[in-house]
Design a protein with these regions (language model features):
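Activation targets extended, charge/polar-rich intrinsically disordered C-terminal tails
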Residues: 2-28, 32, 153-226
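Non-catalytic ligand/cofactor/substrate-binding and regulatory segments of enzyme domains
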Residues: 31-32, 37-182
């Protein structure tokens, strides 16, 4: 009986490893798109051991597109603003765990099952060129436009309309420069923050692995397939 249980556990772990390997080495999209456009735009993929964000360099056009975020305290027009940083995730874990010291059982449980989603937005200065956890990616102007549109479409809005106001989650932030907003979709362990980041990169014309639930796998796949 004990050996049977061990074999089942071992088989399950082997299957998970196989899925992670295949999810990384099999590209999405499977066939490379049109690469004729000049990749004169740079975006950043920011990562820590469990989460990824996408950072867009601030310019006048980006300020205009995301001017609505000012109502949530995001200082898009601040003269020192260099990047707008976007991250999608599960509401309980994302909003209640700013540091590992804040880790609690219920948010972890919800992140492993099913939870409503939120969008975290921060405005930052520049990032050092050699900063760990920062991957610089080059994309075309058309890819950049698609990416901005996809990020904007990830916000949940009043009346469910694309032109409606974004929904600020009042009283929740990590510091003075960031805010949380209601987002579209549901978060779970299989389709989490890193699969959202992968989907955004795909919109930008960056190929990723087919399924990359971990930051390290997403970074590896972006290097492998581009």
């Amino acid at each position: 009986m004990f050996r049977t249980v061990l074999k089942s556990i071992g088989g399950g772990l082997l299957l998970i490893v196989l899925l992670l390997v295949l999810g990384t080495v099999v590209p999405r999209p499977f066939f490379a798109g049109d690469a004729s456009g000049v990749r004169d735009r740079e975006i950043l993929l920011l990562s820590n051991p469990i989460h990824t964000d996408i950072a867009l360099p601030v310019d006048d056009d980006l300020r205009r597109v995301f001017s609505e975020l000012q109502e949530g305290g995001i200082a898009v027009n601040h003269p020192a603003a260099a990047y707008l940083v976007f991250g999608w995730g599960g509401r309980s874990f994302y909003t209640e765990t700013p540091t590992w010291a804040d880790l609690k059982p219920m948010p972890v449980l919800r992140s492993l099952t099913l939870d409503r989603s939120v969008m975290h937005v921060d405005v930052t200065g520049d990032f050092p060129a050699d900063l760990a956890g920062v991957k610089r990616l080059r994309i075309s102007e058309a890819g950049y436009r698609r990416l901005v549109t996809a990020i904007r479409a990830s916000f949940l809005r009043d009346d469910g309309r694309d032109g409606g106001k974004v929904r600020l989650i009042s009283g929740v932030s990590y510091g003075l420069t960031d805010a949380f907003f209601e987002a579209k979709g549901w978060f779970n362990a299989l389709a989490g923050c890193n699969t959202w980041s992968a989907a955004m990169l795909q919109e930008a014309g960056i190929r990723t692995g087919w399924w990359t639930p971990l930051p390290l796998l997403l970074r590896w796949s972006a290097t492998l397939h581009n």
